[in-house]
């Protein structure tokens, strides 16, 4: 677990660059995978994942939008398409990652629990999955082991803004300066996961107050029953909201289907 800065927007760059480095470290000597930039897959479900794609296109050449839901926004029956309908990069092209945003706060799409198990098995086993969980972290259980990277800004569910927490699988933490792959650009030092991991998140001055207050929030969460209890409280509150909206459909028109 790393404590970084730059918010979720900083991780749009950091996740991509570090995953390209991890790809080069693993596949650099493979003649099929090491000669050119690998594809990176993105699922665009709203404004935040769209911004992540825009940043990726600045930094690498093979950005594949596996599913784009932007055109569906505003349709009250819109739902997240099943992964078997996505245009994922072929596994034999060694994609560097699959990126998605767990919950789009602006446009309303939230991925269902356990959706990753619906991806093709070979894809799940070979491609690191990167999740932006900024707006629903600690609101429900998340399968950390199914992901390569999970990041979240503290300001929505954890504590004050200023700290960004990143959960990284250990085998994906590599030294980008030791690589020879031309498709890995120089990474700013404070965005390198290895720098932060090797220095206990103290590579540069950390946002101490934000970390301290977040710690208070974590302790309170545990005292109140942890994530399962928080999920149940959220369920009760959301049911009240949705039932009220159903009674007064003229007051608010949903932009996506309820399960989304």
What are these regions (language model features)?
Residues 16-28, 58-62, 117, 144-148, ...:
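A glycine- and small-aliphatic-rich helix-loop capping segment at beta-alpha/alpha-beta transitions
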Residues 44-60:
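Substrate-binding/gating loop at the entrance of the active-site cleft, primarily
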Residues 130, 144-155, 164:
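Conserved active-site segment immediately N-terminal to the catalytic lysine
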Residues 154-242:
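Active-site C-terminal subdomain of aminotransferase-like
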Residues 252-260:
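Conserved PLP-binding catalytic core of the aspartate aminotransferase-like
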Residues 1-38, 49-53:
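Conserved beta-loop-alpha segment that forms the PLP phosphate-binding cup at the N-terminus of a helix
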Residues 56, 68-137:
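Active-site phosphate-binding strand-loop segment of PLP-dependent enzymes
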């Amino acid at each position: 677990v790393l404590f970084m800065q730059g918010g979720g927007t900083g991780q749009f760059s950091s996740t991509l660059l570090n995953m390209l480095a991890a790809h080069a470290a693993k596949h650099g000597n493979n003649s099929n995978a090491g000669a050119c930039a690998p594809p990176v897959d993105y699922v665009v479900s709203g404004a935040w994942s769209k911004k992540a794609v825009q940043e990726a296109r600045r930094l690498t050449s093979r950005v594949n939008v596996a599913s784009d839901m932007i055109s569906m926004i505003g349709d009250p029956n819109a739902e997240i398409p099943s992964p078997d309908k996505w245009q994922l990069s072929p596994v034999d092209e060694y994609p560097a990652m699959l990126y998605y945003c767990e919950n789009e706060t602006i446009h309303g799409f939230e991925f269902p629990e356990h959706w990753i198990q619906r991806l093709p098995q070979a894809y799940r086993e070979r491609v690191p999955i990167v999740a932006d969980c900024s707006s629903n972290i600690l609101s429900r259980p998340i399968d950390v082991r199914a992901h390569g990277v999970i990041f979240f800004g503290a300001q929505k569910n954890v504590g004050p803004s200023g700290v960004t927490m990143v959960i990284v699988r250990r085998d994906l933490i590599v030294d980008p300066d030791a690589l020879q792959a031309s498709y890995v650009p120089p990474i700013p030092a404070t965005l390198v996961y290895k720098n932060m991991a090797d220095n206990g998140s103290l590579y540069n001055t950390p946002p101490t107050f934000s970390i301290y207050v977040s710690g208070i929030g974590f302790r309170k969460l545990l005292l109140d029953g942890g994530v399962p209890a928080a999920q149940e409280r959220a369920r009760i509150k959301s049911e009240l909201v949705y039932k009220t909206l159903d009674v007064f459909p003229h007051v608010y028109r949903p932009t996506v289907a309820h399960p989304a």
